[in-house]
Regions:
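Acidic catalytic/metal-coordinating carboxylates
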Residues: 35-38, 61-67
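Conserved acidic carboxylate
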Residues: 10
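The feature encodes the CheY-like receiver
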Residues: 16, 58-61, 76, 88, ...
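Active-site beta3 strand of CheY-like receiver
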Residues: 46-52
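Short hydrophobic/Thr-rich beta-strand motif most characteristic of the beta2 strand and flanking loop
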Residues: 27-34, 42
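Alpha4 helix (beta4-alpha4-beta5 surface) of REC/receiver domains from two-component response regulators
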Residues: 20, 64, 87-104, 112-115, ...
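Charged docking surfaces used in two-component/phosphorelay signaling
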Residues: 17-25
Length: 128
């Protein structure tokens, strides 16, 4: 059985660890990065099946990192889900315009996370 790899790019340690814990609980392998630049490098080398990315990070924003990933043949096809605590529609529009597949509002429940994973990894089925 294939185990999907999910990259979590989040500068807030508590938030990143919570995301990683929930994703592992759902049966996925997790790769973590604590800023956008490191996240882009890990995406290029690890080739994850899906990326969760914070929109606001100090060294490189989620928007800029998404643009970088969309410019690479290695990562342009990987679903990117932007995560934000900001509910304003302008952030959703900016994320989708730069190439993200979806936007989720933090905090995220386990069920919401599962729904997003099912939506963007269509070959996936979960028994929960």
């Amino acid at each position: 059985m294939m185990v999907y790899k999910v990259l979590v790019i989040e500068d807030n340690t508590d938030c990143r660890e919570l995301f990683a814990m929930m994703i592992r609980h759902l049966g996925f392998q997790v790769i973590e990065a604590d800023d956008g630049e490191i996240g882009v490098q890990k995406a290029l080398t690890e080739k994850p099946d899906l990326i969760f990315m914070d929109i606001s990070m100090p060294s490189m924003s989620g928007i800029n990192a998404t643009v970088c990933l969309r410019e690479s043949a290695v990562t342009k096809h990987i679903p990117i889900i932007i995560c934000t605590a900001w509910m304003a529609e302008q952030y959703r529009e900016a994320a989708l315009k730069c190439g993200a597949h979806d936007v989720i509002i933090k905090p995220v429940s386990l069920k919401e996370l599962q729904i997003v994973l099912l939506r963007h990894l269509p070959a996936l089925t979960m028994d929960s």
